[in-house]
């Protein structure tokens, strides 16, 4: 036997790779703790917490037509934006082999919907076009990326039967799109749920969606009305599969157009050129004073960009690790193999509430309880994303519960959790965690609108002061940071080989 073959080093095991990834996440979070602004202020939350609990247990809303209108406008923004973004994303996905298209899609999806809303508000005021574009633009980039990855996963054999002279568009029409159609439609339904959450939180910047009334109720201390709004939104998310069916789209789309709110304030699309050519550039640049421009950029970077960027990244890393902890603790509550029939449905309901409630709303609640620091943001991000990933992991566990892999002598309870279910689910759990890393970073940045010292705080302040040059640079820095994290996440997934077999089909199980 050839000794050189025997001398070859053994490839690293899956357990070793996963252990290394977990160690990296743990070290990054621990190193972030001393520098992150997560101090607990001296507050007495128990009285406020009891009032919130009473509001959730006894929801009340006197103006039912206003509640229905708010829900309808939330759905209208989400539905119309997805109806436009999905075909646009599909078109870009067919051109995704071009570097310029990939860069464009990465840049538009790296900016949060609320930041897009603040930008378009300067052009179109508090009108329907602002809300639609705020969701449509980043969602188009997301659809393009995901649809392109779905196409890459399709088997190549059907395409080989076509004539070599057939153009690329026909190849997509005759092979790739029909092959990928179930995954494309399933992911589109999943993005619609995400669009509902995005539409709701657009109310935090003044649009008349659910978030506007929710923020007002919380600020006024009317927790019974806030509870009614939260429960209404949870029911809306939970019943999507009943009222959002393909055959009903011809009814919902015209109704959504009719439900859009009227224009409030100005709407000046002709201002776009001045906004792009003048307003977003600092005065020294417009005057050709390059020395003054350098001084302006250095000052802004040292006083706003760097502090905001550091806090955004630190909170992201802590929230990422805590998300993994929440997932590991929560998925057994909804797993048929671990929870049993009595605990499973309450567990699934808990995860439904966590994944349905936007991070912004959870952070707003925690701010009232713990004061203005990064702690509310970390808790909100971990609970929402942990609830979402736990739901996915529990669904994967349920799918295998009656499979041939199960044996009559398999252990139960804690032993099954530790030795069977968690080892089997852990690679997919990490893969979903890395998929959400980019999202957690975007949400960490936007938490600044609530007063937390992330990049969003400085962006919101710049818009309030009508300093569009500062806001533009800060948004660019946010996008660059987001693209960098997305690149690191993608490379880690590939290096550790922890891609789930069918990530997009699995993700859509949140709709079921």
Where are these regions (language model features)?
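Hydrophobic positions within alpha-helical transmembrane segments of bacterial inner-membrane proteins
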Residues: 78, 82-90, 94, 114, ...
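Cytoplasmic-entry segments and transmembrane alpha-helices of multi-pass inner-membrane transporters
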Residues: 88-120, 149, 329-366, 391, ...
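Short hydrophobic, aromatic-rich alpha-helical segments embedded in or entering the lipid bilayer
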Residues: 47-54, 206-216, 271, 451-462
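Loop-to-helix entry region at the N-terminal start of transmembrane alpha-helices
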Residues: 69-77, 109-142, 303-319, 355-390
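A structural signal for multi-pass alpha-helical bundles of membrane permease subunits
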Residues: 30-40, 118-125, 135, 190-193, ...
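Membrane-cytosol interface at the C-terminal ends of specific transmembrane alpha-helices
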Residues: 128-191, 195-198, 373-436, 487-490
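Hydrophobic alpha-helical transmembrane segments of polytopic membrane proteins
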Residues: 210-245, 455-491
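N-terminal, non-cleaved signal-anchor transmembrane helix
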Residues: 1-79, 83, 87-91, 95, ...
């Amino acid at each position: 036997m050839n000794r050189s073959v025997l001398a070859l080093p053994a490839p690293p095991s899956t357990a070793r790779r996963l252990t290394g990834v977990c160690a990296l996440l743990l070290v990054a979070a621990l190193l972030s703790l001393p520098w992150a602004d997560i101090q607990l202020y001296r507050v007495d939350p128990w009285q406020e917490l009891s009032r919130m609990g009473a509001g959730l247990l006894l929801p009340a809303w006197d103006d039912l037509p206003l509640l229905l209108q708010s829900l309808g406008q939330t759905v209208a923004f989400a539905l119309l934006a997805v109806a436009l973004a999905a075909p646009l994303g599909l078109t870009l996905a067919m051109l995704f082999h071009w570097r310029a298209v990939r860069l464009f899609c990465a840049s538009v999806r790296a900016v949060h919907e609320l930041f897009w809303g603040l930008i378009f508000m300067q052009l179109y005021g508090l009108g329907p076009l602002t809300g639609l574009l705020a969701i449509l633009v980043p969602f188009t980039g997301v659809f393009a990326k995901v649809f392109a990855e779905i196409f890459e996963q399709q088997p190549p054999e059907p395409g080989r039967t076509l004539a070599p002279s057939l153009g690329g568009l026909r190849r997509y029409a005759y092979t790739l799109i029909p092959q990928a159609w179930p995954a494309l439609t399933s992911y589109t339904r999943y993005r619609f749920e995400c669009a509902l959450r995005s539409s709701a939180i657009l109310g935090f910047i003044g649009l008349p969606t659910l978030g506007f009334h929710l923020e007002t109720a919380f600020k006024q201390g009317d927790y019974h009305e806030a509870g009614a709004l939260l429960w209404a939104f949870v029911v809306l998310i939970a019943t999507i599969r009943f009222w959002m069916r393909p055959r009903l789209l011809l009814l919902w789309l015209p109704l959504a157009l009719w439900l859009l709110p009227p224009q409030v304030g100005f709407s000046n699309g002709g201002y776009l050129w001045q906004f792009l050519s003048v307003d977003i550039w600092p005065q020294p640049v417009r005057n050709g004073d390059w020395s003054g421009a350098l001084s302006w950029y250095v000052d802004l970077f040292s006083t706003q960009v760097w502090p905001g960027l550091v806090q955004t990244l630190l909170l992201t890393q802590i929230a990422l690790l805590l998300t993994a902890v929440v997932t590991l603790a929560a998925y057994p509550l909804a797993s048929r193999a671990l929870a049993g029939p009595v605990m499973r449905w309450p567990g699934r309901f808990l995860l439904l509430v966590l994944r349905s409630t936007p991070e912004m709303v959870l952070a707003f609640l925690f701010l009232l309880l713990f004061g203005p620091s990064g702690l509310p943001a970390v808790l909100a991000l971990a609970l929402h994303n942990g609830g979402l990933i736990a739901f996915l992991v529990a669904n994967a566990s349920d799918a295998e519960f009656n499979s041939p892999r199960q044996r009559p002598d398999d252990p139960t309870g804690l032993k099954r959790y530790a030795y069977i279910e968690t080892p089997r689910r852990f690679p997919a759990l990490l893969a979903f965690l890395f998929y959400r890393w980019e999202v957690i970073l975007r949400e960490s940045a936007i938490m600044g609108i609530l007063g937390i010292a992330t990049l969003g705080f400085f962006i919101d302040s710049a818009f309030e002061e009508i300093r569009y040059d500062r806001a533009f640079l800060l948004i660019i820095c946010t996008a660059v940071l987001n693209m960098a994290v997305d690149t690191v996440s993608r490379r880690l997934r590939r290096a550790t080989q922890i891609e789930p077999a069918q990530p997009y089909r699995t993700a859509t199980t949140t709709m079921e």
